[in-house]
Amino acid sequence: MQNIEKKIKKIIAQQLGLIEQKITNESLLVEDLNADSLDIVELIMAFEEEFNIEITDEEAENLTSVQSIFDIIKKYVF
């Protein structure tokens, strides 16, 4: 599970131009990491490609924090 968490943080860091170590599970995408709506769409596409999953529109609306991303991806991977 830590491997998945690390991959998620790496993708977020790459997409948003951040330092991976500054991203915590409690980090909020918009408020803390300054992601805009386009960033979130690009993150979803990157997660879908990396983990070979399809995130529904309803799930996408609930992606507000790093932990929420992990919870949704965990549902598909495990």
UniProtKB/Swiss-Prot annotation:
Its cellular-component GO annotations read: cytosol; membrane
InterPro entries for the chain: ACP, ACP-like_sf, PP-bd_ACP, Ppantetheine_attach_site
Keywords for this protein: Cytoplasm, Fatty acid biosynthesis, Fatty acid metabolism, Lipid biosynthesis, Lipid metabolism, Phosphopantetheine, Phosphoprotein
**Gene3D superfamilies named among the record's database cross-references:** ACP-like
- Where does the record say this protein resides? Cytoplasm
Q: Does the keyword Cytoplasm apply?
A: yes
Out of the domains of life, which is the source?
Answer: Bacteria
Where in the sequence is O-(pantetheine 4'-phosphoryl)serine found?
Answer: 37
Gene Ontology MF terms: acyl binding; acyl carrier activity
- Give the record's family classification: Belongs to the acyl carrier protein (ACP) family.
Record protein name field: Acyl carrier protein
Q: Which organism is it from?
A: Buchnera aphidicola subsp. Baizongia pistaciae (strain Bp)
